[in-house]
Regions:
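Bacterial N-terminal signal peptides
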Residues: 6-15
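Boundary at the C-terminal end of the N-terminal hydrophobic targeting segment
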Residues: 17-22
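Signature of long, low-cysteine stretches enriched in small and polar/charged residues
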Residues: 74-175, 238-326
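Long, solvent-exposed N-terminal ectodomains/accessory regions
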Residues: 48-89
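Bacterial N-terminal signal peptides that target proteins for export
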Residues: 1-5
Length: 368
């Protein structure tokens, strides 16, 4: 009878294990990890901004870190990933790039007319020959530059794409994949940039949340570039658990020798916040932390409301990293956003309610 009970108990445990929540596998840069609970990535807010312009990935207008995007050492490529959107916005991004070029050309044309008027004034006021010559050289440079300012579209046979650049070299392109826009910009395009864009597009794979492609490559939110594992990179992106949207964690992963620092995207005010000492009490955060199997220290501060005040909300910040000198950098930065920011409905939870959950995630990080 004892054996039967034991066998039944074993079967029950096996069934419970089978019904348990599957691990949420994800990746960033050249790392992979498991999340203890559902989360979301910050992405580019395509409805508000043009992907060619400045700005990184966000959760909402005021809830975000700074400098969230992907750098890939393939002609100094910069990549941004949009939030889920429509085909219409994909078309709009293409039009925005063309329109921006036209605006830039118009500014140069206006500048040319201003400099021509200035040349007339200089001559009328009998400025020196050298001054007149300098002004004529400025005008000549503008006259040579203006005809070259034009966006050319290149048909490289890549499905659902727009490829733009100069007449000789394409250097930026948009891909429409899985209801998202992926924007790629080559800051230093090679002579054979057209072929390199075709090669990169062939190696790029759009993916779903919690879907981790096989093989070496550089991972980003909803995307993956397959490669030989040797290309340099720098990926910074934020995530937040859906259960605690007031707290975000920015993860940084950069290849050895990259210029990335664990403090990228932070300001002096993140380390030394201004606050009313009559309302909040400041204390230090310093505790043991793990990124992968490497132990490090999580350091930061917390502002807790004093019990004698009516204030209920709090704020805190913490940062930890491993690597960067002799091995690839992996860093974690934690930020909070108070109730009411962009419609956040809850008070900021204390560090002890969130850090252990982040720790479960960071401790599972493994490099490719």
């Amino acid at each position: 009878m004892t054996r039967i009970i034991a066998t039944f108990a074993g079967l029950l445990l096996g069934t419970q294990s089978a019904l348990a929540e599957p691990a949420l596998h994800e990746c960033l840069g050249r790392t992979r990890f498991e999340s203890p609970e559902a989360f979301e990535w910050a992405t580019f807010a395509i409805e508000r901004s043009n992907m060619k312009g400045a700005g990184g990935h966000v959760f909402s207008k005021n809830v975000h870190a700074v400098g969230d995007y992907v750098s890939y050492d393939f002609d100094e490529l910069t990549i941004r990933v949009s939030d889920a959107t429509t085909r219409e916005n994909f078309e709009r991004q293409r039009n925005a790039i063309v329109h921006e070029t036209e605006l830039y050309k118009k500014r140069l044309e206006d500048k040319l007319e201003t400099n021509k008027d200035l040349l007339v004034s200089i001559k009328e006021m009998n400025y020196s020959h050298d001054e007149v010559k300098k002004q004529e050289e400025r005008i000549k440079k503008l006259e040579e530059q203006i005809p070259k300012v034009k966006n050319y579209e290149h048909d490289l046979g890549i499905p659902d794409s727009y490829v733009l650049g100069s007449k000789e070299k394409p250097y930026e392109f948009l891909l429409w994949r899985n209801n998202r826009v992926f924007y790629f910009n080559m800051n230093k395009p090679a002579e054979n940039s057209a072929q390199r864009i075709k090669d990169l597009a062939a190696r790029f794979e759009a993916r779903d949340l919690y879907e981790v492609p096989e093989g070496p490559g550089v991972c980003m939110p909803y995307g993956f570039i397959h490669d030989d594992g040797k290309t340099g990179f720098n990926v910074k992106n934020s995530l937040r658990f859906t259960s605690t949207p007031n707290v975000i964690m920015s993860l940084i992963n950069a290849s050895l020798g990259n210029h990335a620092k664990p403090t990228d995207g932070t300001y002096d005010t993140d380390y030394r916040p201004g606050y009313d000492a009559e309302i909040w009490k400041k204390s230090k955060i310093m505790e043991r932390f793990y990124i992968g199997d490497r132990m490090t220290t999580l350091e930061g501060w917390r502002l807790d409301p004093r019990p004698e005040t009516t204030e209920q909300d709090r704020a805190w910040f913490a940062i930890a990293h491993v690597g960067g000198l002799a091995s690839p950098l992996i860093a974690a930065q934690m930020f909070t956003f108070q109730k009411g920011t962009d419609g956040l409905k809850d008070l900021v939870p204390p560090p002890e309610a969130v850090v252990p959950r982040f720790l479960k995630l960071t401790r599972s990080i493994r490099e490719q």
